């Protein structure tokens, strides 16, 4: 737990990996607590879905039950005969099929029945938490526009009111591209954070802000003395 907290001190976003087999555990809750305390954006990644014993949808419901309506699905698996080779992006409504040889191709959107609509509803529920205006619209049963959903999720992730959920398999790199591509516009950049307070050579406090033209600066953590 101490190591997690130290790492978050130097991070802009906390990527919290959850086992697709074991689900939410004490470590998950401690990681969320540490990220919240550090004021970081929180992103969940449900991993290990190539394991036939993995149960993504059970884990997703556990995340919602534990952390509330802020948990928002972004990428979900389409599972056939225990195999999760196809992943659906709920934002662009596109499906991608992955191979163990590293190949990936767009494929037809699978028929997921009522489950897909339920997941879209979870997104709307999360977006409704981001502003009074959107909450009123949600309560009145009005549909969000695509722009409202994208902007709502983006802003909600940055201010911490939405925790997006991605999934895949790190070992086979399934859906890792969707996670990384989405983080480029979902997660806050260093420029979105407030500056750090450092000390100059005389030991006096100095504000260190993000500046492309400024001197190089970094945060040291988990160092070993001696």
Feature names for model-found ranges:
Residues 1-226:
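Structural and coupling elements of P-loop NTPases
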């Amino acid at each position: 737990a101490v190591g997690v907290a130290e790492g978050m001190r130097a991070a802009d976003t906390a990527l919290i990996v959850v086992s697709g087999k074991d689900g939410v555990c004490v470590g998950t809750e401690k990681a969320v607590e540490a990220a919240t305390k550090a004021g970081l954006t929180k992103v969940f990644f449900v991993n290990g879905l190539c394991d036939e014993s993995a149960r993504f949808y059970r884990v997703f419901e556990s995340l919602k039950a534990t952390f509330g309506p802020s948990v928002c699905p972004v990428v979900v698996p389409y599972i056939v005969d225990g195999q999760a080779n196809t992943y659906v992006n709920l934002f662009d409504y596109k499906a991608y099929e992955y191979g163990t040889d590293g190949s990936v191709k767009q494929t037809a959107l699978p028929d997921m029945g009522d489950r897909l609509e339920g997941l879209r509803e979870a997104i709307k529920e999360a977006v409704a938490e981001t502003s009074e205006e959107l909450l009123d619209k949600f309560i009145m049963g009005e549909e969000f526009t695509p722009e409202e959903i994208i902007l709502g999720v983006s802003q909600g992730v940055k201010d911490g009111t939405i925790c997006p959920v991605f999934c895949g398999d790190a070992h086979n790199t399934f859906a890792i591209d969707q996670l990384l591509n989405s983080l480029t516009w979902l997660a806050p950049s260093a420029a979105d954070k407030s500056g750090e307070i450092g000390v100059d050579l005389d030991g006096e406090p100095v504000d260190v802000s993000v500046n492309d033209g400024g001197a190089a600066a970094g945060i040291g953590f988990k160092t070993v003395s001696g």
